[in-house]
Amino acid sequence: SIMKMDGSQQEENLEVISTGSLGLDLALGVGGLPRGRIVEIFGPESSGKTTLCLEAVAQCQKDGGVCAFIDAEHAFDPVYARKLGVKVEELYLSQPDTGEQALEICDTLVRSGGVDMVVVDSVAALVPKAEIEGDMGDSHVGLHARLMSQALRKLTGHIKKTNTLVVFINQIRMKIGVMFGSPETTTGGNALKFYSSVRLDIRRTGQIKKGEEVIGNETRVKVIKNKVAPPFRQAEFDILYGEGVSWEGELIDIGVKNDIINKSGAWYSYNGAK
């Protein structure tokens, strides 16, 4: 279809889904993850990738949205999801056998127009059918990348039409023999890097301790790519075990940064109240 941008096509504001972290919503520049787009969240193991996605799912459900979770890693924990505020009984969960099946399910969900957000956890676990049916040790060079490339070509148009947010979680691998620059790369070839409107790099920067006991992680998220606002901003927040993103701690940090809350030593005060 061809159209003229003369105002007859109403320019609407970009719809977003909150990440559950105020600082990250601000860093994204539009107040959350953009709908009708592909988002990639990647980082090392235990950095909070799935937690961040489940926080966003909880926010989407709070606004009356319908969410689907494609669990290719077969590691979804409903008890933990419920603690983060996810209405597990309203969540569509799929645990596919092959990468092709997972992406086919994703495409069907998107085309139906009945879901607002789809999470694929994770790209690394989308194993091509030929690899599953083959023997251990067989070489399947480029198969995973080809699968992703083909699926994203199909998906991207449907995602825009139905205004669905699709989030791909990805893992990090090391490139061998890299002398200069970062040796880190994400799995599944280059297609996802191109098709993503937002790419988030999530890292664990430290531990939160209560006495000797570790009760959470300090987390930093960098916006590596952003097609809907200026990129390269970052957010820092705490993820507490069994609770998710520490909303109160983040609110205080942002308040201090913007001189709304005064900090003196270990005390915080707002309008004279400590």
From Swiss-Prot:
<dbReference type="InterPro" id="IPR027417">
    <property type="entry name" value="P-loop_NTPase"/>
</dbReference>
<dbReference type="GO" id="GO:0006281">
    <property type="term" value="P:DNA repair"/>
</dbReference>
<keyword id="KW-0234">DNA repair</keyword>
<dbReference type="GO" id="GO:0016887">
    <property type="term" value="F:ATP hydrolysis activity"/>
</dbReference>
<dbReference type="InterPro" id="IPR023400">
    <property type="entry name" value="RecA_C_sf"/>
</dbReference>
<dbReference type="GO" id="GO:0006310">
    <property type="term" value="P:DNA recombination"/>
</dbReference>
<dbReference type="InterPro" id="IPR020587">
    <property type="entry name" value="RecA_monomer-monomer_interface"/>
</dbReference>
<dbReference type="Pfam" id="PF21096">
    <property type="entry name" value="RecA_C"/>
</dbReference>
<keyword id="KW-0067">ATP-binding</keyword>
<protein>
    <recommendedName>
        <fullName>Protein RecA</fullName>
    </recommendedName>
</protein>
<dbReference type="InterPro" id="IPR003593">
    <property type="entry name" value="AAA+_ATPase"/>
</dbReference>
<keyword id="KW-0963">Cytoplasm</keyword>
<dbReference type="GO" id="GO:0005829">
    <property type="term" value="C:cytosol"/>
</dbReference>
<dbReference type="GO" id="GO:0005524">
    <property type="term" value="F:ATP binding"/>
</dbReference>
<dbReference type="GO" id="GO:0003697">
    <property type="term" value="F:single-stranded DNA binding"/>
</dbReference>
<dbReference type="GO" id="GO:0009432">
    <property type="term" value="P:SOS response"/>
</dbReference>
<dbReference type="InterPro" id="IPR020584">
    <property type="entry name" value="DNA_recomb/repair_RecA_CS"/>
</dbReference>
<dbReference type="Pfam" id="PF00154">
    <property type="entry name" value="RecA"/>
</dbReference>
<dbReference type="InterPro" id="IPR049428">
    <property type="entry name" value="RecA-like_N"/>
</dbReference>
<dbReference type="InterPro" id="IPR020588">
    <property type="entry name" value="RecA_ATP-bd"/>
</dbReference>
<keyword id="KW-0547">Nucleotide-binding</keyword>
<dbReference type="GO" id="GO:0140664">
    <property type="term" value="F:ATP-dependent DNA damage sensor activity"/>
</dbReference>
<comment type="function">
    <text>Can catalyze the hydrolysis of ATP in the presence of single-stranded DNA, the ATP-dependent uptake of single-stranded DNA by duplex DNA, and the ATP-dependent hybridization of homologous single-stranded DNAs. It interacts with LexA causing its activation and leading to its autocatalytic cleavage.</text>
</comment>
<dbReference type="InterPro" id="IPR013765">
    <property type="entry name" value="DNA_recomb/repair_RecA"/>
</dbReference>
<keyword id="KW-0233">DNA recombination</keyword>
<keyword id="KW-0238">DNA-binding</keyword>
<keyword id="KW-0742">SOS response</keyword>
<comment type="similarity">
    <text>Belongs to the RecA family.</text>
</comment>
<keyword id="KW-0227">DNA damage</keyword>
<dbReference type="InterPro" id="IPR049261">
    <property type="entry name" value="RecA-like_C"/>
</dbReference>
<feature type="binding site">
    <location>
        <begin position="43"/>
        <end position="50"/>
    </location>
    <ligand>
        <name>ATP</name>
    </ligand>
</feature>
